[in-house]
Each structure stands twice: as C-alpha cells, then as structure tokens.
Amino acid sequence: SEIEWGFRFVNAFQVIAITGTNGKTTTATLTHHIISSEFPQTLLVGNIGDSFAAAVSEDSSRPFVIEVSSFQLDGIEHFAPHIAIITNITPDHLDRYQYQMELYIQSKMRIVANQTEQDYLIYDADDPILVAAIDNSKDRIKSRLIPFSTEKLVDQGACLKDGHLVIHIDNQTFT
C-alpha cells in the first residue's frame, strides 16, 4: 500500500497515525495543528489529502500526521506509527468486509499490529466496541495504552474530572 511504501523511508518516531470510523479528519487536523506549533515542518497527509508516499519522496525527514482508513490499513505489513490514535469503531464500510463487523474491527486494529513497547495507542475508552477489541487483543498489543474518556476516570490517559481535563502520563499529572 501507499502507506506501507512511504513508511519504509521514515523513522517510526516521525509518525502519528489516526484511524477510526468517525472523527479521523477532525482529530488529524487538530493533532497537526498542535504538533505544527512546535514543529512547523509537520505534514498532514494520507486519507485527508496529500499522499504520504508522495510527501515522503519530497522530504522524508519531516514529522507526519497521517489519516489512515481501514482500506489503507488492509494493505500494511510493516507500518508501525510511533503514536496510533483510534477515535472509535462503529459499523461502516461493512460491504467491504463481507458484512462482518469483526472483520472491520480487525482492519482498524491493524494500526497497532507492528507497534513496539516504545509506541503508544491512544483510544476512546468510552467506545464499548473499541474497548472490547483492545481487551480481546491485549496479548498482541505491545504499545502503551493511553485511553481518553469524557465519561469515566482513567488511571493512565486523559479524562474529565469535575469538569476539568486531567491527563495522567508516566506518573505525571497535568490539569
């Protein structure tokens, strides 16, 4: 796949990849905006616009925020973003997956297939389908799990507490 080809020419630490049924574009755009404030050369690529492979062929040294669809994930073998974000998983594109939700879930979960213990998976802890998929894959997921929630408190990750955003990462708390 185009994502796979581009990844061959970058360091995984340069890559933040975002997937999910809904919210990919918004999340990718906001992530790009935040990262670009510190690293102005960051590119927003993938399903949202410019090809990741084309961008890499022009300058492989930049950080990349990549919006990745299930279709793109189906073609990966070695793609391993340093940070993977899954916004949610709801029934969509099932015609491509023999109308089997489990096959669609497996496609989305491929984003973490090649991650290591040094990588991160940020995910929506309020999405029961996604939480179940992660629970069912814990023996295969090597990355550090960073949940976010607007409905419950989380020990590690981001949540709302008394109406305020609280982030707990690596024994540090940010409010």
Locate the predicted segments by residue.
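Active-site glycine/GP-rich loop and adjacent strand/helix microenvironment
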Residues: 150-153
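Short, surface-exposed linear segments at secondary-structure transitions and domain or protein termini
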Residues: 155-157
